[in-house]
Amino acid sequence: MTLELVTESLLTKNQINHQDVFSCLEDFCTHNIDYGDFYFQSRICESWSLENGIIKEGDYHLDQGVGVRAVSGETTGFSYADQISIDAVRKSAHMAKSIFDKKEKIKIKPLLNQEKKFFYDPINPLKTFTSSEKTNLLYKVDHIARKTDNRVVQVNANLSGSYEEILVVSTEGNLATDIRPLVEFSVSVLVEERGRREKGRSGGGSRTNYSFFITQDDCFGENRIDYWTKEAVRIALLNLSSHEAPSGTFPVVLGSGWPGVLLHEAVGHGLEGDFNRRGTSIFTNMIEKKVASELCTIIDDGTMKNQRGSLNIDDEGVPGQCNVLIENGILKKYMQDKLNARLMNTKSTGNGRRESYSHLPMPRMTNTYMIPGKSKLEDIINSVDYGIYAINFSGGQVDITSGQFVFSTSEAYLVKKGKIFSPIRNTTLIGSGLEVMQQISMVGNDLKMDQGMGMCGKDGQNIPVGIGQPSIKLEKLTVGGTV
């Protein structure tokens, strides 16, 4: 079904047919290239913003174009056009191949549509609610936040959605299409008490439509947008009563879900194929070597139903896949796109991703998580005599080459004698990805994915990702605090 819809939208409406595309691909092969591809894309985005009970902004944006890539060895020729027409395709193709020498024209395989599984429905979320229904959701958020506690002095909320169509054709004879919906909600609350102000944030999203936000979640016991609004208030109030964090080296318990961002940054990026091909990752040449505790199995899975990082196909037309990266502490594979896979004599793992038609694809994560273990969270906490329990993070940075990272928490607690003692603030976690993976001594049975707000940046390209993990215990980690 997506083939007909996407072909009609991206090709037929722009007076292009399959034979036109095939002809351009054939002309492409008059130069000395290993392979090449055309990436057609259309993306419609909208967002609505509320500040203190007033709709401050409503934005609607349409972007479409085609990116053309020619690859020979390690060299890539790339050109793109911000319009879709047969002339734009031909000109972009000519520019992309022009850096290579000419050769005798060869025939390419007929374009065949790839069979694929669907991990989200081909729907347009922008059409599921009217404009007034979308803004009323935001007004409701403001009302709920202020009703929850009279110390709330400011409420900011954002609702956004996008509808994306892509079509990929290659000199290998592949033809692949996808329709990608995505919705997201975020809320930030400011509370004040006796002159002290603190913030709390929450939200979520999914590859579905806006009704996702007003549907009850069994884990929450209420609809998602109500829960996330109250959660933002809870975190803000918690920060009002928090104490300064201690500093030193302690056992650290990371909660389930979003704390997996530490693994994403400190470990996940280091397992991307391009860094390892260039020898700039701490995991270079470590396949089949022990890189983590035997309790650790880490997956990158683009096939999870409706998850933010899921892909029916990646941005090179390769079907979404589930890849075991680390199994029982042993490094099994890197995440690969087509280019790096060819240069490393392996296959693409379905991780070729790009921000848009105007960017080149590269190896990127999809939904990355650690599988659950056997320990109960209560037992993990009980095992800590004095340490930190970190439930949420606000930001961080990592050096891919050294694996060194620094992360800041947005919700954390001091643990004493196996009991959660008090909330703490200004907490930073400092360490090395490789060392941290060896420090994992307990893995919980409570795997949870993040709520659907993950955004990953690399080389100036931002893409949606999923992050998850069960609760885990790190035997020791450097904690930066103020006490």
Curated annotation (Swiss-Prot):
Q: What class of enzyme is it?
A: hydrolase
Q: What protein name does the entry list?
A: Metalloprotease TldD homolog
Alphabetically, the GO molecular function entries are:
metallopeptidase activity
Listed GO cellular component terms?
A: cytosol
Gene3D superfamilies per the UniProt record, alphabetical? PmbA/TldD superfamily
State the similarity comment: Belongs to the peptidase U62 family.
Q: What is its EC number?
A: 3.4.-.-
Q: Which UniProt keywords apply?
A: Hydrolase, Metalloprotease, Protease
Describe the task this protein carries out: Probable metalloprotease.
Tell me the NCBIfam families matching this sequence.
Answer: PRK10735.1
Please list the disulfide bridges.
Answer: none
Kindly indicate whether the keyword Disulfide bond belongs to this entry: no
